[in-house]
Amino acid sequence: MVTTHVFIAVSLDGYIARQDGDIDWLLKRDDPTEDHGYAAFIADKDWIIMGRGSYEKVLTFDEWPYDRPVLVLSRQLTDTPVPEALKGKVQFSCRTPREALADLMEKNVHRVYIDGGQLIQSFLREGLVADIVITTVPVLLGSGKPLFGVLPHDIDLTLLSSCSFPSGLVQSHYRLMS
């Protein structure tokens, strides 16, 4: 069985990016001495599944930051060739979250990092998320792209842990209840 796991930062008012996708408010708080648990989180993940918006944002970084395979779920990118530098690292697919996980299960994948606001919402709506690590950044944006959208029903969570960092960020780890 493939399990999916979320690791994401949000503003105090619940946004993951400005309306135009800008994450300057997050990047300016980047402290290379604090990894906020990311290394431990990603260590046991076999694959990363992200949405188009996250993929396009990561393409603007100086270097490709991932050392494991990435599946980009997007109807718009399905027929787009993978950039030469990312061949063997990235695949595009228009499959649904459930179908994508079934495909990965056939490849003997066990644990997957889910990244990207809309994609996280899709996985949540389908009941496919095992746990969420949310790092809250002490800034109010007032508007932007929310982490959570409309859900068909309440999703109960159990707090597994919570900690704060010297930079003022607060991280909470939740397990989703069945």
Which residues fall in each region the model found?
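Enzymes that bind and transform nitrogen-containing heteroaromatic metabolites
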Residues: 1-178
